[in-house]
């Protein structure tokens, strides 16, 4: 269908997607999204405010429609131009490999030491740092000496302390509990 021969009234009934597809078919090359929007605006005779209102939906429709493909950097084309195997190659950015620097000493590369290859002696490290060894019993004793065990006066201070009658380990069942 040739859209160039349509009247302005017929053009206003076209969707932005249809016009975008027509423009890309006519150009036969990729186009930046802002340029595509300007061409659509000129073709349909839309005002800036009108195109801004429809822009978000148009971009969404282009992403959803299977006829268009984004090639990165906001460049769009028709999916029909690209065979399936070439799409991945076209979309990927071209990077140039870094040039290797020449080193004066090639032996350094061969003697790379990994952390897995090194055995660390923990006792030597402790001696070097001058740290003292701490036993678990010392840590547990320090925790028992905290001041958090004392309740402040107030509501907590008014509470009665309930003592456990069976703390000595000689627990026998009370015949009345049965």
UniProtKB/Swiss-Prot annotation:
Domain HTH HARE-type residues, every copy: 14-81
Tree of life domain: Bacteria
Composition skew (Acidic residues), residue ranges: 105-122, 141-150, 161-178
UniProt GO molecular function: DNA-directed RNA polymerase activity
GO biological process, one term: regulation of DNA-templated transcription
UniProt keyword annotation of Transcription present: yes
Pfam family, one: HARE-HTH
Sorted UniProt keywords: DNA-directed RNA polymerase, Nucleotidyltransferase, Transcription, Transferase
GO cellular component entries: DNA-directed RNA polymerase complex
UniProt keyword Transferase present: yes
UniProt region (Disordered), positions on chain: 88-122, 141-178
Record InterPro entries: Asxl_HARE-HTH, RNAP_delta_N_dom_sf, RpoE
Function, as annotated: Participates in both the initiation and recycling phases of transcription. In the presence of the delta subunit, RNAP displays an increased specificity of transcription, a decreased affinity for nucleic acids, and an increased efficiency of RNA synthesis because of enhanced recycling.
Subunit structure: RNAP is composed of a core of 2 alpha, a beta and a beta' subunits. The core is associated with a delta subunit and one of several sigma factors.
HAMAP family named in the record: RNApol_bact_RpoE
Family classification: Belongs to the RpoE family.
Protein name: Probable DNA-directed RNA polymerase subunit delta
Organism (species): Listeria monocytogenes serovar 1/2a (strain ATCC BAA-679 / EGD-e)
Protein encoded by which gene: rpoE
